[in-house]
């Protein structure tokens, strides 16, 4: 087995590393840099990747693609895609399959393709350094990436000519690099604020075992959003001073974006900076220049709410892991945005301790991916990585209830089966609808996909045994199967990347689950009450058909009256009324039970009398002497 490289496929920058002996090493690219801008440009029928693409962005904004990681695995109608359309100079278009693609140089590209071009650059960088062909890689993704986004990332690797041995979560990779060859046992938090995404993971590290206890995050929050705030501020100030709106000028926007990013970085180490952009635009009076003094205090005011948005996922991750802030022994900072003093201050305030700054936030994820690659090709031993799935997975059951098969923060790989049945008599097929989320009703969660299991032999409802199995592999990709135990018929499906979950939807699912917990509980209780009542109606009608003639007309009338009342109550949404009528029918059913018992007792008594009353026949016989 050859070398397995580790790639941090970032929103803003990417990085590649490999195990060299017993240590992971970041590999410099052809430009002599340890990280490569995640930017692709198409100019004069040529494709540029990384720094060369970034350098020409100002003069070629419409054909320069950046931050495509925000689009990967997303549907064109996703609110986050719509938001992104107003932030980038290139065109985001709707693909035939409904996904969000990009358009450049009169061609349409999927985000997986654009990502593949970046991965190819990483692959070439590694091959130039190692002097051998590289075909296998471990690629990192945000911990909160959903199934569609993970598959799309894996597809990007395949397009780039790489066999993706493992998709690994970025905070987990960072923890691997942080805890590699350290013997101490610790509970740590990894706070990862990168160019486009935010993740937080809580891990326990002990004797080479890296166990993720919980994870949370926001897949549409990162440095790009900070840059946009600065950019909008510059547009506003310039408009106030000159009366000219730069927001419709692609060339000016690209220059402003670069200036915003540069100012943001400078203000991490200084309290004030000058933003000078000569000849930013022109009008009838001549050329216009932008010259603005920008302070750290102004920046912090602009982005304060963005920083605050990272704290709630931290709080939720701790809650899910069963920890308090003072249980965390180390907070590891990952991602370029964690260099910002205000971010470090917010982390310190929440966790009550100084964050650990002993790792390079731009490189630590790639180093961790390389270590995982070393584990997979046996270069590294004595390391066990236990990661988790970020959201609950389940199916829709009778009444629209979301029945969980795998809870969020379950260790992966994981496999879970549960037996379900049919809702109607002689039902020959069932539709399995797979959802992801935290709400009690399926419709409030995200539909990942659906499939049919057909050919179920005719049987009364509740009799067929349909085993539904969820299987999440080590990459976090979901496989679902349904099998009729009687006929052996089986249907399997891998949830396909046909849109995936948006960051807003994922975040909203958890928040809605908390804010609407009471409402969800009541709704679930109503559904369960109705299901129980419906089953009682069904069994009562069946019993009446079989034993109704054993009841007196008065007893039968009482049961039928209670049955009619419960049916009427089932038409309402009143759980207490349904419970009351269910109780009445249950009591009335006692009469049927008594009649059945009486009939059975009489039959047994009759059989016993028949045996006792049988006549004994005396037989005459002769005793014949032996001769």
Swiss-Prot record:
Keyword Chaperone attached: yes
Pfam annotation, one family: HSP70
Entry-linked Gene3D superfamilies: 1.20.1270.10, 3.30.420.40, Actin, Chain A, domain 4, Substrate Binding Domain Of DNAk, Chain A, domain 1
Record family assignment: Belongs to the heat shock protein 70 family.
Database matches in SUPFAM superfamilies: Actin-like ATPase domain, Heat shock protein 70kD (HSP70), C-terminal subdomain, Heat shock protein 70kD (HSP70), peptide-binding domain
Molecular function as annotated in GO: ATP binding; ATP-dependent protein folding chaperone; unfolded protein binding
Role description: Acts as a chaperone.
Protein name according to UniProt: Chaperone protein DnaK
Residues recorded with modification Phosphothreonine: 197
Keyword ATP-binding: yes
Keyword terms, alphabetized: ATP-binding, Chaperone, Nucleotide-binding, Phosphoprotein, Stress response
NCBIfam families with a match to the protein in the record: PRK00290.1 (NF001413), PRK05183.1 (NF003520), prok_dnaK (TIGR02350)
Organism this protein belongs to: Rickettsia prowazekii (strain Madrid E)
Swiss-Prot/TrEMBL induction comment: By stress conditions e.g. heat shock.
Alphabetized InterPro entries for the sequence: ATPase_NBD, Chaperone_DnaK, Heat_shock_70_CS, HSP70_C_sf, HSP70_peptide-bd_sf, Hsp_70_fam
